[in-house]
From Swiss-Prot:
The chain crosses the membrane at residues 251-271, 339-359, 369-389. Residues 122-148, 741-763 are annotated as: Disordered. One of its GO terms (cellular component) is basolateral plasma membrane. Divalent metal cation transporter. Mediates transport of divalent metal cations in an order of Mg(2+) > Co(2+) > Mn(2+) > Sr(2+) > Ba(2+) > Cu(2+) > Fe(2+). It is found in: Cell membrane. This is Metal transporter CNNM2. The gene is Cnnm2. It holds the Pfam family CNNM. Residues 251-431 form the CNNM transmembrane domain. InterPro entries: ACDP, CBS_dom, CBS_dom_sf, CNNM, Ion_transp-like_CBS, RmlC-like_jellyroll. It is a multi-pass membrane protein.
Length: 875
């Protein structure tokens, strides 16, 4: 004991090392102290006495060696990685069979051999009870007061022979867990660690190691060896030394079958998602349209899909229910394979998004009709499978939301759809304009398309339908012309150009006569009338022109109807086709913008048909025409029926320029224009006064007297006797006198023209020869007599405005020729042709272009009738 004083530091060091080698025992001692008091502490000190004695007796060299070889101290274990099969539960490690688990070892002096000092046992640490204490002997040690030897170490858990160190305070070891025995669901294992102590030499003289973990002798001389001499396995006294091995997790299905099911479910998920988009995007209206106007393949597809698509809510519920069921099952199977919830969620999300949503929806959005038709049997199958759940829900949706109608486009949407799809459809611009115009017909009013009143061509009701007025109407190009009285806004009648078909401009008929006769109704419409309603009115046939008016209630006074303009059927049609209708008479492309037609030639000029002032036909009453005709036929021998037929005479009197007028000028009474005849000036015409007064100056004495109506002069000018005749021989007579002098009275019954037949060709000389027997009083008439001129020896001057008959020699001779043709027996066609040709030649002088054209046309008609009569030499 004394000698031990010098070794006190070594003893203390050895005692400290011993204490470090037994951490679990120290912790047990502390718990015993707090639980049982000082008695327990004294018992623990008594058990440490041999160790203290051993430390005191050790040599200085031995103590130094023990200090250099420190014992490994294991404090506890933790799982390095946790998952669904390896985790901490209630302070115990829970792992699965047939797995390898990495454990982190915490302690002191962790080295490469630490893995060999760890083991597990199946036997739980034995706990002593108070009944086990001896009655007469010394008290047994407390259950928790010191280390306890482990039971049999298990071979179900194998410590793999390697370790990963970290600063000698921790390291990672790996253990392999064998399968559980049959019928075992789980099994508990407990941690054991190894302790090794040096054995003392015999006789006490040997030097032995005093540290835990050294290899020494069997014990100290005179003392029994400790129970953990050599290598001893004891229970680890920590709280996390229990390991529970559970049964290996089994898959719901075999792995290969589970992979097949996952692939199939992924395909079904994509199919449900694609059909949901593809079929539900095909509304019933679109399917009906495709059935009627699609291609043959599209019609077949739509016919197969339409019965299923008609049950919209039922189809929707079936597809959604199937999609949700498939996606849920897919996630469960992936979780079973992956073994981790997070991994299953990530993998299932990626798979469903890519292969179950994006790809199928991208395909079905473009080819939904074909995909839906080719998979219709699968759709019907799943509708039957989900019938118990989806059908009631669909009926509930039908009751709440109503029956599905489909996409219906209004006018604006339809127009916009046509505009947007214009690059992709086969509509040409004109077709698109017509469709657009027809759809916009109900949105526009007549005020938008009407012609304003200021731009309308109108005619006053006081107008006279003479050549100028009718030419103006024809040049306007309009077929319906409003007629107004007073102001232009006071439209009272409507004139159709076809009403003027039987109106002669020479008749100067008042416009009111025509409008009252036809009495076309006026059609008034209000300015807010829609174009579709206006079109329906025009289609009824009442009128193709309407007068636009509005109620003017501005200012003071009563409201009144104000005429704004006119609208026609052409305006409505132009609005429908979105284009201007240009005919040959239009001057403007648009009656609102007043843009003129670029290619339009000059307007038609009717001035070529207008008579000059000298050619203006004088109008006489039918009664005066009859009296004039009877007077000439009975009183003037040259116009008697024996010389000229009454029919030809009537045509002659109706011929232009036969009846003329002369305006008397009071300021210039002696003007040459006032003389009908002047002495010693040759003339070739006959004059019959119809109205007015004339002064006749005759003879060398210059006798003057006045004459009035139905006095006639110049009969000899028609026959042109070779010598001038005196006044007595020119029979200046009154109304009751008969012209006898100078007339061919000797031969009142001239012979009929001989040698005339259908093949005769009458030249001018032939006609003169044919008429010669009627113009002389003897059988020896000279054709040269026609070349003579008549020179009167009197003057006839107007005293007032005159209206008279003036027949030239040429007109008279042509009338005689026509009379002879009329008396000649021949076909009616030839007769009419010859008479017309003869009367056409009654103009003085050479024929103009119009006369030549008419002669040529008559000749063509005559040749077609196989007649050879020509008009050569017509003057």
């Amino acid at each position: 004991m004394i000698g031990c004083g010098a070794c006190e530091p070594e003893v203390k060091m050895a005692g400290g090392q011993a204490a470090a080698a037994l951490p679990t025992w120290k912790m047990a001692a502390r718990r015993s102290l707090s639980a049982r008091g000082r008695g327990v502490l004294q018992a623990a000190a008594g058990r440490l006495l041999p160790l203290l004695l051993l430390s005191c007796c050790c040599s200085a060299g031995g103590c130094t060696a023990a200090g250099e070889n420190e014992e490994t101290v294991i404090i506890g274990l933790r799982l390095e990685d946790t998952n669904d099969v390896s985790f901490m539960e209630g302070g115990a490690l829970r792992v699965s069979e047939r797995t390898r688990v990495k454990l982190r070892v915490y302690g002191q002096n962790i080295n490469n051999e630490t893995w060999s000092r760890i083991a597990f046992t199946e036997h739980e640490r034995r706990r002593h009870t108070p009944g086990e204490r001896g009655l007469g002997g010394p008290a047994p040690p407390e259950p928790d007061s010191g280390p306890q030897r482990c039971g049999i170490r298990t071979s179900d858990i194998i410590i793999l022979p390697h370790i990963i160190l970290n600063r000698r305070t921790s390291g990672i070891i790996e253990i392999e867990i064998k399968p559980l025995r049959k019928m075992e669901k789980s099994k508990s294992y407990y941690l054991c660690t190894s302790l090794s102590t040096p054995a003392l030499g015999a006789g006490g003289s040997g030097s032995a190691s005093g540290t835990v973990g050294g290899k020494g002798g069997a014990g100290v001389a005179g003392l029994p060896p400790p129970p953990w001499a050599e290598t001893t396995w004891i229970y680890h006294d920590g709280e996390d030394t229990k390991m529970i091995v559970g049964e290996e997790k089994k898959f719901l299905l075999p792995f290969w079958l589970q992979v097949i099911f996952i692939s199939l479910l992924l395909c079904l998920s994509g199919m449900f998602s694609g059909l949901n988009l593809g079929l539900m995007a095909l509304d019933p209206m679109e399917l009906r349209i495709v059935q009627n106007c699609g291609t043959e393949k599209e019609k077949n597809y739509a016919k197969r899909i339409e019965p299923v698509r008609r049950q919209g809510n039922y189809l929707l519920c079936s597809l959604l229910l199937g999609n949700v069921l498939v996606n849920t099952t897919l996630t469960i199977l992936l979780d079973d394979i992956a073994g981790s919830g997070l991994v299953a969620v990530v993998v299932s999300t990626i798979g469903i998004v890519i292969f179950g949503e994006i790809v199928p929806q991208a395909i079905c959005s473009r080819h939904g009709l074909a995909v839906g038709a080719n998979t219709i049997f699968l759709t019907k199958f799943f509708m039957m499978m989900t019938f118990p759940a989806s059908y009631p829900v669909s009926k509930l949706l039908d009751c709440v939301l109503g029956q599905e109608i489909g996409t219906v486009y209004n006018r604006e949407k339809l127009l916009e759809m046509l505009r947007v799809t214009d690059p992709y459809n086969d509509l040409v611009k004109e077709e698109l304009n017509i469709i657009q115009g027809a759809l916009e017909l109900r949105t526009k009013t007549v005020e938008d398309v009407m012609t304003p009143l200021r731009d309308c061509f109108m005619i006053t009701g006081e107008a006279i339908l003479d050549f100028n007025t009718m030419s103006e109407i024809m040049e306007s190009g309009y077929t319906r012309i409003p007629v107004f009285e007073g102001e232009r806004s006071n439209i009272v009648d409507l004139l159709f150009v076809k009403d003027l078909a039987f109106v002669d401009p020479d008749d100067c008929t008042p416009l009111k006569t025509i409008t009252k006769f036809y009495n076309h109704p006026l059609h008034f419409v209000f300015n807010d009338t829609k174009l579709d309603a206006m079109l329906e009115e025009f289609k009824k046939g009442k009128s193709h022109l309407a007068i636009v008016q509005r109620v003017n209630n501005e200012g003071e006074g009563d409201p009144f109807y104000e005429v704004l303009g006119i609208v026609t059927l052409e305006d409505v049609i132009e609005e429908i086709i979105k284009s201007e209708i240009l005919d040959e008479t239009d001057l403007y492309t648009d009656n609102r913008t007043k843009k003129k037609v670029a290619h339009r030639e000059r307007k038609q000029d009717f001035s070529a048909f207008k008579q000059t002032d000298s050619e203006t036909k004088v109008k006489i009453s039918p009664q005066l025409l009859l009296a004039m005709h009877r007077f000439l036929a009975t009183e003037v021998e040259a116009f008697s029926p024996s010389q000229m037929s009454e029919k030809i005479l009537l045509r002659l009197l109706k011929h232009p320029n036969v009846i003329q007028e002369l305006k008397y000028d009071e300021k210039n009474k002696k003007a040459p224009e006032c003389y009908l005849y002047q002495r010693n000036k040759p003339v070739d015409y006959f004059v019959l006064i119809l109205q007015g007064k004339v002064e006749v100056e005759a003879g060398k004495e210059g006798m003057k007297f006045e004459a009035s109506a139905f006095s006639y002069y110049g009969v000899m000018a028609l026959t042109a006797s070779p010598v001038p005749l005196s006044l007595s021989r020119t029979f200046v007579v009154s109304r009751t006198e008969v012209l006898a002098a100078g007339s061919p009275g000797e031969n009142k019954s001239p012979p009929r023209p001989c040698g005339l037949n259908h093949s005769d060709s009458l030249s001018r000389s032939d006609r003169i020869d044919a008429m010669t027997p009627t113009l002389g009083s003897s059988n020896n008439q000279l054709s040269s007599s026609f070349l003579q001129v008549y020179i009167p020896d009197y003057s006839v001057r107007a005293l007032s405005d005159l209206q008279f008959v003036k027949i030239s020699r040429q007109q008279y001779q042509n009338a005689l020729m026509a009379s002879r043709m009329d008396k000649t027996p021949q076909s009616s066609d030839s007769e009419n042709t010859k008479i017309e040709l003869t009367l056409t030649e009654m103009h003085d002088g050479l024929p103009d272009e119009t006369a030549n054209l008419l002669n040529e046309q008559n000749c063509v008609s005559h040749n077609k009738a196989n007649h050879s009569l020509h008009s050569e030499g017509a003057i």
